[in-house]
Amino acid sequence: MATGQKLMRAVRVFEFGGPEVLKLQSDIAVPIPKDHQALIKVHACGVNPVETYIRSGTYSRKPLLPYTPGSDVAGVIEAVGGNASAFKKGDRVFTSSTISGGYAEYALAADHTVYKLPEKLDFKQGAAIGIPYFTAYRALIHSAHVKAGESVLVHGASGGVGLAACQIARAYGLKVLGTAGTEEGQKIVLQNGAHEVFNHREVNYIDKIKKYVGEKGIDVIIEMLANVNLNKDLSLLSHGGQVIVVGSRGTIEINPRDTMAKESSIIGVTVFSSTKEEFQQYAAALQAGMEIGWLKPVIGSQYPLEKVAEAHENIIHGSGATGKMILLL
């Protein structure tokens, strides 16, 4: 390490495993931005379920060890490399990706994954935009090609991606239904775009949804837990309806005939497959939503960096999401 190089606190993962492999260190060198890169002083970082899958080693993409998790940071520009002319020191920004990892006091990001954060949103809200809103937008607009007047059911609607999907769907003129497992979660879902909400902890909640939508069924289902819900989803769809799989924590057996009768589709989505150009399209639409006011992230549990392992435990095994989980720095 170069003499006099600035140090920072950062969470490091040296082996794949449970939350206990998240190690907070205080002697990590602050990255230096190269061409087309920006260094951000992190004020808040979003915690996403996918980060727990990556940490456990069960996700399709595995980072080289050791690494620092986290892609969704919000803070201020500390420094820029060459040709990063869109930003200057002190600019308020948020990211959709990082190079060095977001669970840290400073994060390095490619300049095309950094966006100006409007004054009307605070840093916690800025850290809640990245994966949730870009994923929800990709699922609804890019993959499902939703149209105004169609119906959408958002499973797990009280979490980060779910609330983002509700807000986007409502803004685009859809009939929005959501599910949540707590009274508080249901209330938040209704406050953020849903026309109706159902308690997925009730044994007969699928019957209630069927009664609500009638014979036509649901045009699009945004599915956060496909290994639990996929069979039920297929029974809820309209003719030509689509299940957009955003999340799954295991396997499930389905009867392909259930897709044949209604000529329905099951489509998987990951925001990591987005091209640079697609990210720019999504960002433009989402930044318009910030200005208009329909994009307003809801913040849930908040943790200091020292409690990152607890955050990872709770995002998977907690009793029910009520907004976006955030690390505060």
UniProtKB/Swiss-Prot annotation:
GO molecular function, one term: NADPH:quinone reductase activity
EC number: 1.6.5.5
UniProt keyword list: Acetylation, Cytoplasm, NADP, Oxidoreductase, Phosphoprotein, RNA-binding
List of residues that carry N6-acetyllysine: 23
Reactions performed catalytically: 2 a quinone + NADPH + H(+) = 2 a 1,4-benzosemiquinone + NADP(+)
Keyword Acetylation: yes
Subcellular location: Cytoplasm
Keyword RNA-binding: yes
Residue(s) carrying N-acetylalanine: 2
Listed Pfam families: ADH_N (PF08240), ADH_zinc_N (PF00107)
InterPro entries: ADH-like_C (IPR013149), ADH-like_N (IPR013154), GroES-like_sf (IPR011032), NAD(P)-bd_dom_sf (IPR036291), PKS_ER (IPR020843), Quin_OxRdtase/zeta-crystal_CS (IPR002364), Zinc-ADH_QOR/CCCR (IPR051603)
N6-succinyllysine PTM sites in chain numbering: 296
Binding site for NADP(+): 53, 158-161, 181, 200, 229, 246-249, 269-271
Similarity section: Belongs to the zinc-containing alcohol dehydrogenase family. Quinone oxidoreductase subfamily.
Role description: Does not have alcohol dehydrogenase activity. Binds NADP and acts through a one-electron transfer process. Orthoquinones, such as 1,2-naphthoquinone or 9,10-phenanthrenequinone, are the best substrates (in vitro). May act in the detoxification of xenobiotics. Interacts with (AU)-rich elements (ARE) in the 3'-UTR of target mRNA species and enhances their stability. NADPH binding interferes with mRNA binding.
Protein name (record): Quinone oxidoreductase
Lineage: Eukaryota, Metazoa, Chordata, Craniata, Vertebrata
